Each structure stands twice: as C-alpha cells, then as structure tokens.
Amino acid sequence: MMLARLTAKPEGKLAKQLCKVVLDHFDTQYSRELGEAWSAARDILTSPSCWQHAVLLNRFNYPFELEKDLHFKGYHTLFQGSLPYYPKSLKCYLSRIPHRIPSERHQIGNLKKYYLLNAASLLPVLALELRDGEKVLDLCAAPGGKSIALLQCACPGYLHCNEYDSLRLRWLRQTLESFIPEPLENVIKVSELDGREMGDAQPEKFDKVLVDAPCSNDRSWLFSSDSQKAACRISQRRKLPILQIELLRSAIKALRPGGLLVYSTCTLSKAENQDVISEILNSCSNIMPVNIEEMARTCSQDFAFVPTGQECGLLVIPEKGKAWGPMCRSKRFRRGPPHTEASTPPPTSSSIKEQYILPICMYILYVGINIIAILFPPSKLII
C-alpha cells in the first residue's frame, strides 16, 4: 500500500542545517516588510518536518487505486470552494497534516501516475485559465511542474516550454517525458532560449504566457550548505529585479493583443514581487491590471494570504496547517494595442549568461512563493 511509506522526520533531526547568514538577512528584511506575518512564516520555513506536498494526479495515466487510498487516509481535493476557473480534469489532493508520499522514478516508456508539488504553485496555473486549443508559453519552465499542471487543465493547441539553463533543460525534458503521452508531444515544443529574447523571436504569438521567474528562492536559500556562497547570493540579490523586469518585457511582446500573462516567483521579497510589477505598470502603457482579490477569498480555506497593497497581487505565506508557500501571486494585466510600450528603455544587465544562470540555480529547489501577474490587451478587457 503506497501510503504506508509516508513518514515524518523526527523533530530536531533535519536533513539540512539552517544557514545563519541567510536567516539573519531574511529576519532583517522580512520583519520590516511583513511585520508579524514573518514570525509565523519563519516557523514553517525553518522546520522542514512541517512542509507539505500536494499530490497532482496525472490524467494521462490515472491512478484510481492511489486516489482511493488518498481518500482513505483523509486527503481532500484542493480548492473545494468555487473558483471561476477550475477544470474537472485537474485533480490535486492534500492532507491537513504533514504527510510525505514517495516520488516515482523516471522510467523510459512508462508514464508516472502523480506529481508532488507545493499546492501554492497551482495558483499561477489556474490564473492563466487555459482553454483547449490556445497557444501558451511557459517562459522559465524547468523543472516542468507548472507545464504538467497546465496539461492537466486543458489540451493546448501549442505549448512552448522554454528553459535557458542546460542542466535544468534536461530535467524539464525528463519531466515532460514522464507525464505526457506521445500523441500530445506533437503540440509541445521545448527550447533553450534566453527568455529575454523570446518576445523578439516570437512576437504576439501566444494567447497565454507564464513567467515563473528566477528569484531568490527563500526555502532553498535558508538551507544553503555553503555560507560563503550564500553571502554571495545575498549580495547579488539586488540584480534579480532587473532580470525579472527584462523577462516580463519580453513576455509582454510575445503575448498577443487580448492575451493573458501570469508572473510568479518563489520569494517573499517585495523588490522581486510588488516593485517589479509596479515598474511594469508604470513603464508599459499597453497593459492593465486585473483585480484577483476574489481568488484569495475563495482559496482561504487552503492558503494563508497577506496584503500586497495591490489589487492584482496575492502573497501566499506558510502558516501552521497551511504550510504552502511562500508564494506571491500578483497582477492580472490586460495588454493593449501592439507596439505601444512607453519609451522608457528597459534596464540592462552586463554578462547576460552569468546573471541568468545564478538565479536559475537558486530556483532549482522551488517549494513555493509565487507572485502572479496577468496581462490583457484592452481589445478584450473584461470589467
């Protein structure tokens, strides 16, 4: 029985040690930015035994027996409230208490039955509201969890999964191979392009775009094994918003008029979340934010949110019993007529390859803060 293997690590026996350099940095920054909310989030983030995994079932090799077992063990389906968009084909289960289910091994020719993920990472996917036949771009796709989730929601006419880092690209390819049947592979393209070049390479091509941007991954950073490298990451953290803004500008170019864009990160950092979105809103005249506060009300049973000061933004933080996040989901925007961006030039960065790879590597252990940004052109503005 698969769930018999679920075990929790004994209290105090962590697989990794906390990195004091990072924790001190976060204490200083997030106490200022989040106030009392940081204290509760800190307790969860520093205690891996409290972390939870949701179980996303693969509709292309559906695990009926596992689903029965999950019900028997007290798991429940995610998003039991009525979201405006929630496809019946998307089945995700979670437990109220920390349970661990073993991940499946990759076997060539055999599709996996489920994918383990932080439940908060489904919020950007649902925010895209993917429909059958649409063209969708996952700009920073590795390790592939959100691409897999998108394919559980609908059958796109074309799914472009892009990843700039070569090591993570191999991981992405393996993930897709493990979950997607051969007939569906014909509508999926995998590329290794610098995301900042995608808008010029594929202008106004996509109905939906997901930018799950490289960021300072809070959970991963807290358990950095090398204090010197951790200090170096902290010193370079201020460069990340430049990269994120450049990726967003490129994504906007790749979005067709009337399309939708979602921006997400896995950090609580205001500079990488709210400030990035504010810069885009102030410098791009062809986008408009969309109020997503209703999603927070609908999802409050499973997630804890803190205010971002922006109607188009949601910040998910972990707390006891709702250990999902951190994840910031911000901004729904609508895109305006083509070629109407403000004249303000985008920020530039020297050494493109060097600056891009660093945050990609930091992002490798993503466990969930996301900020979402959604963009539409006024041609299909829905009030």
Model-predicted segments: where are they?
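Structural detector for hydrophobic anchor residues on beta-strands
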Residues: 122, 160, 218-219, 327, ...
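C-terminal catalytic and target-recognition region of SAM-dependent MTase-like enzymes
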Residues: 262, 266-360, 368, 373-383
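Residue-level signal for beta-strand positions within conserved beta-sheet cores that form or flank
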Residues: 155, 184-186, 285, 342
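Glycine-rich nucleotide cofactor-binding entry segment
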Residues: 3-153, 160-182, 187-202, 241, ...
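Helix N-cap motif at beta-to-alpha junctions
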Residues: 59-62, 223, 353
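Mobile active-site "lid"/loop adjacent to the S-adenosyl-L-methionine
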Residues: 154, 191-193, 201-250, 254-258, ...
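Short glycine-centered segments of the SAM/dcSAM-binding site in methyltransferase folds
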Residues: 135, 158, 258-260
